[in-house]
Amino acid sequence: MRAGDGLALRFPGLGPPTLVSADPAALRAFVAEHRVVVAAPVGGCVGSRVLRLDRHDPNLPHLADIVTAAGTRAAVLQPYLRETTAGTTRVHVVDGEPVAAVRHPPADAGPAVTCRVTDRDREICAGTAPALVAHGIHFAGLDLIGRYLVGIDATGASLGRPGAPLAPEVCAEIAGELLDGTFLSPVPAGACPAPAGTR
């Protein structure tokens, strides 16, 4: 789970069970149902103030108060996914179509590697495509853990960071798909007016 990934929460059928609430009692009930969950305050930085909550932990009431700031701040809760131990997959999409994928193993478990797009990945891409394109998001990165969508990067910033894993390889794959013309959206007539003095 990535705190602040509000886009991913708009597709409940594609992600794990999720609770967004500032009510400590609701949080405790969610933990009781799912046994072990991951919790983070809404709007927090990725990976910051993330807590793992266990229904058998005697400190659970105190931790629920911490993550909600005593009921004054909403938190996002999702069941802990065992597939997390295998790492996350970032599927890069253009106009809703998957064009490249990178698997990021857990910390200290080896480098990121390119991987194939699975049928489940394509199902998730198809489920998010209409909404993303409708909101003008033509390039995005979908973050998956196992069979679940857990985050959406609508900025593409991950490929622009210095030292981003496999950025050249992924960009080359994306460029190849774009140059092939498969995912280029048609430009409406008049959308790109001629420069002054050329008419």
Identify the residue ranges that each predicted region occupies.
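Short, charged, surface-exposed secondary-structure boundary motifs
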Residues: 3-6, 27-30, 47-50, 152
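Glycine- and other small-residue-rich loops at beta-strand/loop junctions that grip anionic moieties
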Residues: 19, 80, 142
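ATP-dependent carboxylate activation and anion-phosphoryl transfer catalytic cores
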Residues: 116-199
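Phosphate-binding site of ATP-dependent enzymes
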Residues: 24-25, 32-38, 42-135
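Conserved N-proximal alpha/beta basic substrate-recognition cap immediately N-terminal to
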Residues: 1-20, 25-26
